[in-house]
């Protein structure tokens, strides 16, 4: 009995931990839903429209895009796909006539590139797997393809749902649940006068966990203010620096000559790359050489050597204080020479975001994950102006200022109140500085007169008393 109780407790703890890991408190309903709509039956299977909808408010899927996989329940094959393709055909040797598109029991599907012939396209396809965040671009948060499945069931009762769904977006981090049959999707005809519906529909829900995606954070935060000369940098090794130092083409440390082109390698896999993160000095010849911005097939970053070793740094500067308002400056810097960020997003949590007056160079959208609690907002770039964060270098930064109206019941510059509680970049939480390092408010001037003036006044009073 005691053993059974312990086993049950362990199971409940495991389930609780797995749910908690994939839960984002600033986007509690965020997920990616994959929906299969069977739109017609074929002699040996069915044709399904597969739609992937990103319901995450501020996390997108960047290049090289998504990869969706699953395991067939029986011996199904993919006869054809429109709007996507399987990465491997597999062993189709038993087919004598028409050859299927894929015979793999565990196919992996990727989006097509833009510009493919029209007869290979379908609505919401062919974007190289790039999917926007729902809060930033709802129209771009959907991706779709059509698949013809053979050697499968041909009725609602004989179709076996695929299992073991996986989603890479583009790297790890997503966990998908089982396929669940739901009420059939209803469609409106173009003239909106007739309704049709799918023959069968099932959905799969995938949630993201930053802990599964990377051992280390992928961004860090630094602070400064007008009322204190202290600049609080990102924490040392905020994104991982390894435990056995740097290795590679020279140490690049204190004895390295500026501009000698030496590089270092972070053996700790900072920024989520376990194979070691190479870095180069910002003033080295290599940083200015042709090809330094060329991405690698494995996605390994090339970072500028810093104490924090993060691909992204977010700097929050408390800039000005007015009678009824105060102003903060936000600057985002890219330290990765091999990656730019299209349609980047920045999320900040701060109590005064409930009274934003103006954002000067970014788009701003309040996020209300808990109804009327308005302390979280999303910043993103202006289209064709700064919605692209360039690679590391002189143009690898974007910045804006935020003007907020004071609420005198809560406003203060003391004890770090003016700095954000949390910062997210592209959906990943950034490493904050330790609270005891925040720029402090200098002591106020004494209310009474200076000591020298008080002493002089006391001496004069004594003289007057003696004279009297």
Curated annotation (Swiss-Prot):
One of its GO terms (biological process) is cellulose microfibril organization. Coiled coil: none annotated. It is a lipid-anchor; GPI-anchor. InterPro entries: COB_C, COBRA_pln. Glycans are attached at residues 31, 156, 164, 228, 340, 355, 374. Residues 444-468 form a propeptide. Residues 1-22 form the signal peptide. Disulfide bonds: none annotated. Residues 251-278 are annotated as: Disordered. A lipid is attached at residue 443 (GPI-anchor amidated asparagine). Belongs to the COBRA family. Involved in determining the orientation of cell expansion, probably by playing an important role in cellulose deposition. May act by recruiting cellulose synthesizing complexes to discrete positions on the cell surface. This is COBRA-like protein 5. It comes from Oryza sativa subsp. indica.
